[in-house]
Design a protein with these regions (language model features):
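N-terminal acidic leader/helix
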Residues: 1-27
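Amphipathic alpha-helical packing elements
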Residues: 24-68
Length: 73
């Protein structure tokens, strides 16, 4: 989970929990912006969700691409 570790080391944060009406989502933000927002899939473990979040953060770092499943972007 090197990308999550790097984000937190740089002052960012991650959050896992409900975002009404979504039962479970994982979000990541740096000190300025949301860099990823993922919706937990049916049957997806928290471990798998965290791995997807780590990959999404990596895509932000490499390609400046924000993955936002919460808002449909």
């Amino acid at each position: 989970m090197k990308n999550i570790e790097a984000l937190i080391a740089d002052g960012g944060d991650i959050t896992i929990g409900a975002i009404h009406p979504i039962e479970c989502a994982a979000t990541a933000a740096d000190s300025h912006n949301t860099v990823a927002a993922l919706v937990r899939r049916d049957g997806e473990t928290l471990s798998a969700l965290l791995k997807r979040l780590d990959k999404a953060i990596g895509r932000f770092y490499v390609h400046d691409e924000i993955i936002d499943e919460v808002n449909g972007n």
